[in-house]
Amino acid sequence: MTQTKGIVSAVNGNMVSVTFEGVVSLNEVGYVHVGNARLKAEIIRVRGREAQLQVFEITRGVSVGDRVEFTGDLLSVELGPGLLGQVYDGLQNPLPLLAEKVGYFLERGVYLPALSRTSEWMFTPHVSVGERVVRGDVLGYTPEGALKHRIMVPFHMGDSYEVVFIQTAGTYRVHDVIARVRDAQGHEHELTMAFRWPVKRPVHCYAERLKPTEPLVTSIRTIDTFFPVAKGGTYCIPGPFGAGKTVLQHSTSRNADVDVVVIAACGERAGEVVETLREFPDLTDPRTGRSLMERTVIVCNTSSMPVASREASVYTGVTLAEYYRQMGLDVLLLADSTSRWAQALREMSGRLEEIPGEEAFPAYLESCIAAFYERAGVVRLRSGEKGSVTIGGTVSPAGGNFEEPVTQATLKVVGAFHGLSRERSDARRYPAVHPLDSWSKYPSVLDARAVAYGRSFLRRGAEVEQMMRVVGEEGTSMEDFLVYLKGSFLDSVYLQQNSFDTVDSAVPVARQKHCYAIVMRVLGSVLAFESKDDARAYFSKLGHMFIDYNCCAWNSEAFVEKEKEIRAFLQGESTKIDSEAEGIIRGME
């Protein structure tokens, strides 16, 4: 700790004004003394000899004249082996250990180390004495679950160093010295398996930043096919309350084709975090065959926890994600919900008496949101390997109003927009991603022409539906009515997905391509019916057959039989296919 001390001069909610003597810096951590407790706080503004601190605890009992001590360190997290499978709060306190120490009701001023000081890790050296290393270079390895965890030179060491000592292979604790390095001035530095890094400072220990192009497979048809996300990309899921944002994120976290998932639950209901904690240990990661919890880190600040630490939780989550990216891994960060984070910013901005922007959010809201999403990306490390951080954030606009500031600021910086619709969720069309309002800048797992052909039916079908509401079904031509039925068919059998069915909840890319080719045959078929009732009955029967087909295990006997039945049904009504659709299908097959 530094020798800088201060005393409380004013208290306003969870913001404390402190008069100090000495040197302090923005985002530095300080502790406010209240009786026997020390409340953690962060400097958010410095003016002359007075600083404003946001306290990460309830400030009940804090009074003018209380002592404040400053640490000289920025708000930071501990990085090292043992992060996977943990549940932290926004300040990286392990919540299960906190519960053991103080019970289920959190006490103020209790902080525990993020990484276990007693656990031992099998260390295998990667460098030899005499080699030169820089920050981010690998010193050795230790197994962490199914991953090969890299022990790296701390990111804050900006010089080039010579290795003068490296431990032999064996078991060590996280704070045992595993290497010593010498800088250009001849000073030696001891290195351990763990180090600290400020949460609001992006990690730049890489050779090159690349453009995200490789699709991130989520196993959700509507996302992978129509509104894809790339590894290292960004996307947002805005939607009204109860539209299915959290369920969609949970499905993504279970099935996404990534190595590590970081869930930052900032300001959401505690029940949703509890659901994750109950489900994930029992679920199997299809890539490794191990428990899903072994690849997951949860950073949760629920709505019942102090508001200030919500802001810290998203930064804590993205810093942990960047750490695993430096190991050449693909990481997915899910922030639920960024609206609560923005509300925490608004609350603190109001207490600082700053000039408010739209809806009382701070004027710098857009730059804060942009700086957060810019920490996503694909990078090429110095070793030549690639790592990525993909950020997906939910937005909870009041009343589902997408024109509010948080949604608009997010739309300017993300690469994909998965807008959830109240109309679709009320109709139980899940996932309730609106097929016309949503968009993506990333390449799909399917052929672009096939996707465009399907979207044309969704768009034209919606136009016909609007027309039918005015003139009725009788005033609609058979040609338009068939376009409407084909659009509804595509929606019901491909866009909608049953997240509670063991088969339909996760659809591999090979199956998506195979099934979409059959859907294309339906969309491109030239059909003739005597009446609209016959057309409706035909598509109703075909839709039910396809929904049963979706629930058959991929390449199983039931799957093959159901596909034969569907193809025979299609052949019975029409063998002629539109030339454009036929060309696309031939290219897909």
Curated annotation (Swiss-Prot):
Top-level class of the enzyme under EC nomenclature: translocase
Cited InterPro entries: ATP-synt_VA_C, ATP-synth_a_Xtn, ATPase_a/bsu_AS, ATPase_F1/V1/A1_a/bsu_N, ATPase_F1/V1/A1_a/bsu_nucl-bd, ATPase_F1/V1_b/a_C, P-loop_NTPase, V-ATPase_asu
UniProt keyword Nucleotide-binding present: yes
Family: Belongs to the ATPase alpha/beta chains family.
Pfam family name, one: ATP-synt_ab
Organism the protein comes from: Treponema pallidum (strain Nichols)
The keyword Nucleotide-binding is annotated on this UniProt entry: yes
Task of the protein: Produces ATP from ADP in the presence of a proton gradient across the membrane. The V-type alpha chain is a catalytic subunit.
GO molecular function, one term: proton-transporting ATPase activity, rotational mechanism
A GO biological-process term: proton motive force-driven plasma membrane ATP synthesis
Keywords, alphabetical: ATP synthesis, ATP-binding, Hydrogen ion transport, Ion transport, Nucleotide-binding, Translocase, Transport
Protein name: V-type ATP synthase alpha chain 1
Reactions this protein catalyses: ATP + H2O + 4 H(+)(in) = ADP + phosphate + 5 H(+)(out)
Residues where ATP binds: G239, P240, F241, G242, A243, G244, K245, T246
EC numbers, comma separated: 7.1.2.2
Top-level division of the source organism's lineage: Bacteria
